[in-house]
């Protein structure tokens, strides 16, 4: 399983004792975690501004991810120009899932599959992982 992480997921995983960070740490044993320079740069800028003491840990975590090229190409979905590099990155990285918390820009696509990439929230992704037996409900 290949999972592309949006910038807001990378940022959220930077919080101390984050349940999301714990989930992603466990998930690394079952999946390839991906991002691209576009998401990485946005997340790092936000961590540096809002959680500067976590910047080193954030960089360490992101260094464990597979970095896919930032590419832009035409898509058959309605998406803001600023969000195209995220979905295009997930597609270019052959991700099975794009995990994002961006309800404003991706909300209309939640649960949909675009070019073999299913766009999900963290909660939706947890359901997928539970159904696949990768994690247990707790």
What are these regions (language model features)?
Residues 36, 104-138:
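Acidic, PIN/NYN-like endoribonuclease modules and their adjacent C-terminal/linker elements
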Residues 10-13, 73-79:
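Short, flexible loop segments at the rims of nucleotide/cofactor-binding pockets, characterized by
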Residues 1-35:
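Short, well-structured N-terminal submotif of metal-dependent ribonuclease cores
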Residues 76-83, 103-106:
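Acidic, metal-coordinating catalytic cores used for nucleic-acid/nucleotide bond scission
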Residues 81-98:
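Acidic, metal-associated active-site segment
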Residues 9-10, 39, 86, 104-105, ...:
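Alpha-helix capping/helix-boundary segments
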Residues 26-33, 37-77:
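PIN-domain endoribonuclease scaffold, especially VapC-family toxins
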